[in-house]
From Swiss-Prot:
Key words, A-Z: Chaperone, Cytoplasm, Ribosome biogenesis, rRNA processing
Protein's name in the database: Ribosome maturation factor RimM
Species this chain originates from: Mesoplasma florum (strain ATCC 33453 / NBRC 100688 / NCTC 11704 / L1) (Acholeplasma florum)
Family (UniProt): Belongs to the RimM family.
Any Pfam family: RimM
Length: 166
C-alpha cells in the first residue's frame, strides 16, 4: 500500500483498558462520517513502514477513537504503537477532511486578500474577506454566484461578482 493513497487520521496517544485497545487522537481537520465502515487501519512505524491492522471493534469517546485490533488481546501487545501515526484508505468516505478556511488566501480580479473569519449561516459557509489596499472587510457566501474555484491544496479561493457585497 502506497502512503500517498492513505489519509492520515491521527495518532495513537495511549492504550485503553487491559484487553489491547488503543486510543487514537484524531487530527483537528478529520471528521468521522461512518464509524461502522472502518474495518482496516494502517499504523506507520518509526521506519515509515505501513502496517495494516484489522479492526475488531471501534467506538468514539469525545474526540478520540477507541480501537480493538483483531490480533491484539492484551495491553502489552499494543504498547509499542503509542505515538505512532494512524492512516486509513478512505475508499468508503468513513472520514472526511474539514478545511479551516481562515488559513486561505483570496484572489479577485488580480487583487489578493485573505480570509479573516468564517461562519455558517445555516445554509452556506461564509468567509469574511479583506482585500489588499482596502480598509473594510466584507462577508462572501461560498456559493457558485461568488466563487470561481476553491483550491484546498493551495488554499486559495478565487472569487467573482463580489462588487455588490463590498
Amino acid at each position: 500500500m502506497e502512503n500517498k493513497n492513505l489519509l492520515s487520521i491521527g495518532k495513537i496517544v495511549n492504550t485503553f483498558g487491559i484487553k489491547g485497545a488503543v486510543k487514537i487522537a484524531l487530527e483537528k481537520s478529520i471528521e468521522v462520517n461512518d464509524i461502522n465502515g472502518i474495518k482496516l487501519l494502517f499504523i506507520e512505524n518509526t521506519n515509515n513502514v505501513i502496517i495494516p491492522k484489522q479492526v475488531e471493534s471501534i467506538s468514539m469517546q469525545k474526540s478520540h477513537l477507541v480501537v480493538y485490533f483483531k490480533e491484539h488481546n492484551h495491553i502489552n501487545e499494543v504498547e509499542i504503537f503509542k505515538g505512532k501515526k494512524v492512516k486509513y484508505l478512505n475508499d468508503n468516505d468513513a472520514f472526511s477532511i474539514f478545511y479551516d478556511l481562515t488559513y486561505y488566501s483570496v484572489v479577485y480580479n488580480k487583487q489578493n486578500g485573505k480570509v479573516i473569519e468564517t461562519m455558517f449561516n445555516g445554509n452556506h459557509d461564509l468567509v469574511k474577506v479583506l482585500l489588499e489596499n482596502e480598509e473594510k472587510a466584507f462577508w462572501v457566501p461560498l456559493v457558485d454566484v461568488y466563487t470561481n474555484n476553491i483550491d484546498d491544496e493551495s488554499r486559495i479561493i478565487t472569487l467573482k461578482n463580489i462588487e455588490g457585497l463590498k
